[in-house]
A protein has these predicted regions:
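P-loop NTP-binding core
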Residues: 1-345
């Protein structure tokens, strides 16, 4: 297995079905194409972690909640360990077997699927604190760290150091980040190590302005300016292999896919406007209350009998997986994908 394709799923606007899409897209990569997939929850709201724990609890016949997770089994631990390294010069150590929630999926008739994993997050970290903390608290802790001229560089390369140290991307075919609807330092960490970013979006007037703005922010304000600011450091031959993530090109916009569309709404004019500037996938994820409800219970759309013909969630997400893999030139069996789309996961 080579290095994983790394995708950040992101939209700075909330309420677009991002986490639901992360879960179903990743389940599709695993079920339809047989790929080993790691999800990493970087959203302080912990929604993806909640969903995955529901599935894992069903599989293990033991209810596990976010507050039951020890800190060393969360992504919070990664950021905390590197903050310790900065302040106390303590070298981080990670046990991926402990950190990663492995083979978490239990689907139709409690069928089990390996190869769909998660690094969870928590909002119940009470280590060295008299109240529970989450990733948003760590965001503040990171911002408080001042390291002279290299402050920003250190802030946005924490995950780059972790990926370099653990070689985690050699264990998977795909790694997908679920990021908060904000341009946070933690989001920037995900973008630094990513090959692509994928935008789920409602097709409305705000999106026609917001998507180009977010694209320019990522490409220019974040990456171009950082590379210019730290050009000498990045050109250095010193042993800083983790900086290779910044030495490469900025992550590419993989594309945009429409979410939460109502079947009686015509938004073709907005789609044409967005498609003039960016890749807009044909795949449309329709607005079904059932999809959100079953996903929140830890069931992917491929495990649920929601029969709505061409609007069915399993058909829509199956098409999205097909389009994404085709767009990046990733080899897969298209006939097998289309066949498995109508089978139970």
């Amino acid at each position: 297995m080579g290095k994983a394709i790394k995708i950040t799923m992101i939209n700075y606007k909330g309420g677009v079905g991002k986490t639901t899409s992360v879960y179903n897209f990743c389940a599709g990569l695993r079920f339809l194409c047989g790929k080993r997939v790691l999800m990493i929850d970087l959203d302080p709201q912990c929604s993806l972690t909640n969903i995955c724990l529901k599935s894992y609890s069903r599989m293990s016949a033991k209810q596990i909640k976010i507050e039951d997770l020890s800190i060393d089994k969360t992504v919070n631990y990664i950021f905390k360990e590197y903050l310790k390294q900065i302040s106390l010069s303590i070298e981080p150590h990670f046990d991926l077997d402990d950190l990663i929630l492995k083979n978490l999926y239990s689907g139709h008739n409690n069928s089990k699927y390996d190869g769909l994993d998660l690094i969870p997050t928590t909002m119940f970290d009470t280590e060295n604190s008299n109240y529970p903390k989450g990733l948003d608290d760590l965001e503040i802790d990171i911002a408080r760290q001042h390291l002279g001229d290299n402050t920003l560089l250190n802030h946005i390369t924490i995950l780059a150091k972790f990926f370099t140290c653990t070689k985690i991307e050699e264990l998977y075919d795909f790694i997908v980040f679920d990021c908060p609807p904000a341009n946070s330092l933690i989001t920037q960490n995900a973008l630094v190590v990513s090959d692509y970013y994928l935008i789920p979006s409602i097709m409305d007037d705000m999106s026609s302005y917001g998507i180009p703005h977010m694209h320019n922010l990522i490409q220019n304000t974040i990456f171009r300016q950082v590379k210019e600011l730290y050009a000498k450091v990045l050109e250095s031959t010193l042993e800083t292999k983790y900086l290779d993530y910044l030495r490469k090109n900025a992550p590419g916009l993989l594309g945009i896919f429409e979410t939460l569309r109502k079947t009686n709404v015509d938004n073709s004019s907005i789609r044409r406007l967005i498609a003039k500037k960016h890749v807009l996938f044909d795949s449309v994820i329709y607005n079904h209350v059932d999809t959100a409800r079953t996903t929140s219970d830890g069931l992917a759309c491929f495990s649920v009998d929601i029969n709505k013909d061409v609007y069915s969630p399993h058909t829509c997400y199956g098409k999205l997986v097909d389009e994404v893999l085709t767009h990046i030139g990733y080899p897969f069996d298209k006939v097998a994908l289309q066949t498995k789309t109508n089978q139970w996961m």
